[in-house]
């Protein structure tokens, strides 16, 4: 299990525990469960990279303790 922190820069920080084999779509669903927003509206970024739903966290080299940027569309 790894823990990922997502910050939306509006004062909301979400900590999510998941597996490295989970997809970005799975991570968005876990974030949506904590924030109360729909997972379709969530966009996850790191710098200028937008993470796509079907790709696994390990493929993006997302590891324990990493911070991601959380945006809403």
UniProtKB/Swiss-Prot annotation:
GO terms for molecular function: protein tag activity. Gene3D superfamilies: Phosphatidylinositol 3-kinase Catalytic Subunit, Chain A, domain 1. It comes from the Eukaryota. Residues 1-73 form the Ubiquitin-like domain. One of its GO terms (biological process) is protein modification process. It is found in: Cytoplasm. It holds the Pfam family Ubiquitin_2. InterPro entries: Hub1/Ubl5, Ubiquitin-like_dom, Ubiquitin-like_domsf. CDD domains: Ubl_UBL5. Keywords: Cytoplasm, Ubl conjugation pathway. Signal peptide: none annotated. GO terms for cellular component: cytoplasm; nucleus. This is Ubiquitin-like protein 5. The gene is ubl.
């Amino acid at each position: 299990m790894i823990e990922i922190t997502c910050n939306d820069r509006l004062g909301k920080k979400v900590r999510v525990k998941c597996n490295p084999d989970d997809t970005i779509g799975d991570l968005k669903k876990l974030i949506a469960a904590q924030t109360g927003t729909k997972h379709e509206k969530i966009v996850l970024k790191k710098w200028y990279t937008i993470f796509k739903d079907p790709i696994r966290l390990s493929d993006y080299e997302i590891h324990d303790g990493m911070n991601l940027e959380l945006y809403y569309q």
